[in-house]
């Protein structure tokens, strides 16, 4: 898995390359003016042709002239020219410098003929002169079934207007014998060109619906179109097949992608061999019959593109994407210092920079590890480490460490994970209530053993003290801490939250806030309120509604944001004076007898616990119990301890278990 920093570097190169191939504002304005002018002129040509046809039909017919206005309003489909639509690069927004082919489709009511093409060509310059003072050259190309329009000013632009009709496709799809074939006019335009124009219209509508909304898709398409223009190997893929591949590659990802990562994903798709013979092919979604969009490419062309994509993917993996884009490598956006971190990072005001390359070191000491350790000591002794947890810091010092899960012990409701890591032949172990916490403890041990002040000693002590208090059932300490936190200032609260964000977010009792809130209020729904930032710096805001109140939390991912929202709800509703209102506690009367007093205190401790401790079902006073052991309740999980029913005991049941202690030692693994 590549680091986020490498994707950010790819994003910078791709965006710089995109800025060099994107048309200038003057070029875009010229394109917009030319296309709008021709569209309006074609509308005037259509009106002129309709008026001419009506005047011919209505000569000498007074009644027909009176009904002309009504028929025009009722039957708009009677126009000879039905409409004009944008297709190709103009409709999809894929224009780049030196590749600005402008295309329009002129839809006709009947099958287009050479006569109709000449009429439109002759009248179009007249209508253009009425709209603008700019001069345009209008030419007819019968073989292309189109009219070519060129401007005389800079930048030089060419607009192609293709004539077609829906009747051509309908007739082509009819089977023999279904209907009587209509006679085509003798001067009918090229049928294949008209069909291609209809297909281009479908492609434009599909692209606007599926690809325009994908983040980075249009940018990647412009980059790849420039690649097709520069490299002859990629030329056969240019056009509709390239658009399909980009949409499928980027659209199948479950999250928005940056420009660099999206380009790499397209290259991965091509490098996997989907173009090669025997592969899945490329389905054309705009055709009724199953059609392969790659059918026009030869086997040799497919193999050449696959080989080129694999080479580009290797260059990108080694940080040389600038070679794929044919541009100069960009300088780093952060100035490197003599040490591994910049001055701003030492002061805690910036994020960590890239490591110093080994070849940059100067001195007699040739061991790069010793150089890095010496530099780290100089930095860490002068200032505290910036806001990074021990696991992230260790990964910067020794990247690629493998953490292993040694064991998982404890009951299901209170597991204990033991993780280990091997550093320079020495194995370090640590435990925690979760794998993440155990890994964090291991990282702290390794940093301490290597002689680096971690700044997380207080966190480790807090975690260990919380675990001890949980095991002993001393919830009084937790309640006092929560009450003290309630009385603290806003600055103290924000400082506490900052410390918590270094590692996994846990409640005062050491549990996951989402799990603990779910135990108190089941069936809660978390909603995503907002998602901001780039692909390498996301910011999510989640919201949860508890008892009619809404709580929000933010974080770099949805999991952390949910935990923050749940933690806010717990601190607001289930801590301090609010805890008594939301959760009623039943306190049993104190007894003065020895054994019974011990049993009562144990039951009270269990009731006060945060949920991990098991409540003994117990027997009624006076019930017989076997000597030598504690009477177990039903449902004890795996023999670790006795357990109460899943949904609590009856309210009036006497919670006084009869406990008889043996005269000989009880094995520690039997019931505790």
UniProtKB/Swiss-Prot annotation:
DRBM domain ranges (all copies): 386-452, 509-575
User: Cross-referenced CDD domains, in alphabetical order?
Assistant: DSRM_STRBP-like_rpt2, DSRM_STRBP_rpt1
GO BP annotations of the record are: cell differentiation; spermatogenesis
Subcellular locations according to the entry: Cytoplasm
Q: Where is this region: Disordered?
A: 348-370, 463-494
Where the protein is mainly located, per its record?
A: cytoplasm
Q: Does the keyword Nucleotidyltransferase apply?
A: no
Output the Gene Ontology cellular-component terms: cytoplasm
Biased composition (Low complexity) is annotated at 477-490
A GO term for molecular function: DNA binding
The protein's matches in InterPro entries, at most eight in alphabetical order, are given as: dsRBD_dom (IPR014720), DZF_dom (IPR006561), DZF_dom_C (IPR049402), DZF_dom_N (IPR049401), NT_sf (IPR043519), STRBP_DSRM_1 (IPR044472)
Can you tell which superkingdom this protein's organism belongs to?
Answer: Eukaryota
The protein's UniProt keywords, in alphabetical order, are: Cytoplasm, Developmental protein, Differentiation, DNA-binding, Repeat, RNA-binding, Spermatogenesis
Basic and acidic residues composition bias: residue spans: 356-370, 465-475
- Which residue range or ranges hold the DZF domain? 5-362
The UniProt function text for this chain reads: May be involved in normal spermatogenesis and sperm function. Binds to double-stranded DNA and RNA.
Q: Under what name is this protein listed?
A: Spermatid perinuclear RNA-binding protein
Organism per entry:
Gallus gallus (Chicken)
């Amino acid at each position: 898995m590549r680091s986020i920093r490498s994707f950010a570097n790819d994003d910078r190169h791709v965006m710089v390359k995109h800025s060099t191939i994107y048309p200038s504002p003057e070029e875009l304005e010229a394109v917009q003016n030319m296309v709008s002018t021709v569209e309006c002129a074609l509308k005037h040509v259509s009106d002129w042709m309709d008026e001419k046809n009506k005047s011919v039909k209505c000569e000498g017919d007074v009644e027909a002239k009176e009904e002309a206005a009504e028929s025009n309003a009722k039957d708009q489909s009677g126009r000879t020219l039905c409409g004009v639509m944008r297709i190709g690069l103009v409709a999809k927004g894929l224009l780049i410098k030196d590749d600005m082919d402008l295309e329009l489709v002129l839809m006709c009511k009947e099958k287009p003929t050479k006569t109709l093409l000449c009429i439109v060509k002759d009248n179009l310059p007249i209508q253009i002169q009425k709209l603008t003072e700019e001069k345009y050259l209008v030419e007819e190309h019968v073989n292309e079934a189109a009219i070519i329009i060129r401007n005389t000013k800079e930048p030089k632009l060419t607009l192609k207007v293709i004539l077609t009709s829906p009747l051509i496709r309908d007739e082509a799809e009819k089977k023999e014998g279904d209907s009587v074939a209509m006679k085509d006019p003798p001067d009918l335009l090229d049928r294949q060109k008209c069909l291609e124009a209809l297909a281009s219209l479908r492609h434009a509508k599909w692209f606007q619906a599926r690809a325009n909304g994908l983040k980075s898709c249009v940018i990647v398409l412009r980059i790849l179109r420039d690649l097709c223009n520069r490299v002859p190997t990629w030329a056969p893929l240019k056009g509709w097949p390239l658009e399909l591949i980009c949409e499928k590659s980027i659209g199948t990802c479950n999250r928005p992608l940056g420009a660099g990562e999206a380009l790499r994903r397209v290259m991965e798709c091509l490098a996997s061999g989907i173009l090669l013979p025997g592969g899945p092919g490329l389905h054309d979604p705009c055709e009724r019959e199953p059609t392969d969009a790659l059918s026009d490419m030869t086997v040799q062309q497919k193999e050449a593109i696959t080989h080129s994509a694999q080479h580009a993917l290797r260059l990108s993996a080694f940080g040389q994407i600038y070679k794929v884009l044919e541009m100069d490598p960009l300088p780093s956006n952060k100035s490197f210092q003599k040490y591994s971190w910049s001055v701003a990072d030492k002061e805690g005001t910036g994020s960590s920079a890239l490591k110093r390359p080994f070849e940059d070191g100067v001195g007699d000491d040739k061991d790069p590890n010793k150089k890095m350790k010496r530099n780290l000591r100089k930095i860490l002794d002068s200032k505290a480490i910036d806001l990074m947890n021990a696991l992230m810091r260790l990964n910067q010092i020794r990247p690629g460490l493998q953490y292993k899960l040694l064991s998982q012990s404890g009951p299901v409701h209170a597991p204990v994970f033991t993780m280990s890591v091997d550093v320079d032949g020495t194995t370090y172990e640590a435990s925690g209530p979760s794998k993440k916490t155990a890994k964090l403890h291991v990282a702290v041990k390794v940093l301490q053993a290597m002689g680096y002040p971690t700044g997380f000693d207080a966190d480790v002590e807090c975690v260990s003290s919380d675990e001890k208090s949980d095991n002993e059932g001393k919830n009084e300490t937790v309640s006092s801490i929560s009450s003290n936190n309630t009385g603290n200032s806003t600055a103290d609260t924000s400082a506490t939250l900052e410390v918590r964000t270094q590692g996994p977010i846990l409640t005062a009792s050491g549990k996951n806030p989402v799990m603990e809130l779910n135990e108190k209020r089941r069936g809660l729904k978390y909603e995503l309120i907002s998602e901001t930032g780039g692909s390498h710096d996301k910011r999510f805001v989640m919201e949860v509604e508890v008892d009619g109140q809404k709580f929000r939390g933010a974080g770099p991912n949805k999991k952390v944001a949910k935990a923050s929202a749940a933690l806010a709800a717990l601190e607001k509703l289930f801590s301090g004076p609010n805890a008594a209102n939301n959760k009623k506690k039943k306190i049993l009367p104190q007894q003065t007898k020895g054994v019974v007093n011990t049993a009562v205190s144990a039951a009270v401790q269990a009731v006060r616990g945060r949920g991990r401790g098991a409540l003994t079902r117990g027997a009624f006073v006076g019930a017989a119990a076997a000597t030598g052991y504690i009477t177990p309740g039903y449902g004890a999980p795996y023999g670790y301890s006795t357990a109460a029913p899943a949904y609590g005991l009856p309210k009036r049941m006497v919670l006084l278990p009869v406990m008889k202690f043996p005269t000989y030692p009880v094995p520690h693994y039997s019931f505790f």
